[in-house]
Amino acid sequence: MNLAEVVRFLDDFLEINSYQDVSNNGLQVEGSEEVKKVAFAVDASMESFRAAKAVNADMLVVHHGLIWGGIGYIRGIVKRRIEFLLRSNLSLYAAHLPLDAHREVGNNAVILRKIGAEPQEEFGEYKGVKIGFSAKLEKATAVGEIAEKLGPAMVLPFGEERVRKVAAVSGKGCFALNEAIDAGVELFITGEPEHEAYHLAKEGGINVFFLGHYESEKFGVQSLMEVVREKLGIEAVFLDIPTNL
């Protein structure tokens, strides 16, 4: 398939132009005009670039891209990364906030579905846009039972043992913790822990799961990969390169 067609599909499906973002969302580096195989990863890095080349991908789609608000200087690490992509004829496509907020394949929608809750209200306002979701489980469920569905997490167990109202804001989502407390959320799920969240959660009487920044944001690219396979009929592969952060 032609690169322009793949990019057009992704731009439209993810509504790339609907977000004011620090990330330059969309096609960041142009490579091969023909796309036979697409790799998906959380982060743009030399490790993910090399892994994409190793599986003979023509395009790499990531959540955390290479270009954030423009490139000031093409030297050092930036120079080596761009040089590798161009020499490998490997296209790089990034979707940051669009892949957090998407109701079908977004990180937060997928997190909620994994625990048995359908995303309902938009939640977690960031730069004027809500990028997460809140939801209600069908019945009050033990916090430990929910944790088993998501895998290892750092837990602040400051709320009720059984919860029904939940919310998710992946990645560095502690900015929405106050919003969660004010909204009566009983379990708030995010990625990266922040020191200030401890006493805020304790005083707010809320349970908090910290899945890790990486782990909370691999769901979106994995779900988008399945859509690309189904809708475009292109071979696709997920490159799991955890940061343990």
From Swiss-Prot:
Gene3D superfamilies: NIF3 (NGG1p interacting factor 3)-like (3.40.1390.30). Signal peptide: none annotated. A divalent metal cation 2 binds at residues 64, 213, 217. Homohexamer. Belongs to the GTP cyclohydrolase I type 2/NIF3 family. Keywords: Metal-binding. A divalent metal cation 1 binds at residues 63, 100, 217. Pfam families: DUF34_NIF3. GO terms for cellular component: cytoplasm. InterPro entries: DUF34/NIF3, DUF34/NIF3_sf. The keyword Transmembrane helix does not apply. This is GTP cyclohydrolase 1 type 2 homolog. SUPFAM superfamilies: NIF3 (NGG1p interacting factor 3)-like. It comes from Archaeoglobus fulgidus (strain ATCC 49558 / DSM 4304 / JCM 9628 / NBRC 100126 / VC-16). GO terms for molecular function: metal ion binding. It comes from the Archaea. The keyword Metal-binding applies.
